């Protein structure tokens, strides 16, 4: 089990502590989302790709927003990406830079899923959305390419 934090991550944590930022878990969902969005806004843009397009994936709850990142016209596969945020924070835009980097590093198309988040949507909404996206990817992956 790792007991240390990467130096770059530690710099971020130290900077937040020095600025008096409370830990994420002490914030309301709205406060946490605002903080995460503010952090995302200062992250440099990710690499340029062949194409980036917004789509809607069919789901049990209707349509689920998603974004397809294609590093090339002939990507060999598809990665389904579920953003971080403990099922409470996070968005397509907030993870855009990371997903672009993943698409380039993997050489694969990546579909980033904007699943429903809590507390507005109770369990198992996010898990259902994640499953629906995976089923869609397995059956319609050609659509994403």
Residue ranges and their predicted role:
Residues 121-142:
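Alpha/beta-hydrolase active-site loop
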Residues 76-86:
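Short beta-strand element of the alpha/beta-hydrolase
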Residues 115-117:
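Active-site loop/turn elements of alpha/beta-hydrolase fold enzymes
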Residues 74-75, 89-94:
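Conserved AMP-binding/adenylate-forming
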Residues 1-68:
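A glycine/proline-hinged amphipathic helix-loop "lid/cap" segment
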Residues 92-113, 128:
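Short amphipathic alpha-helix adjacent to the substrate-entry channel of hydrolases
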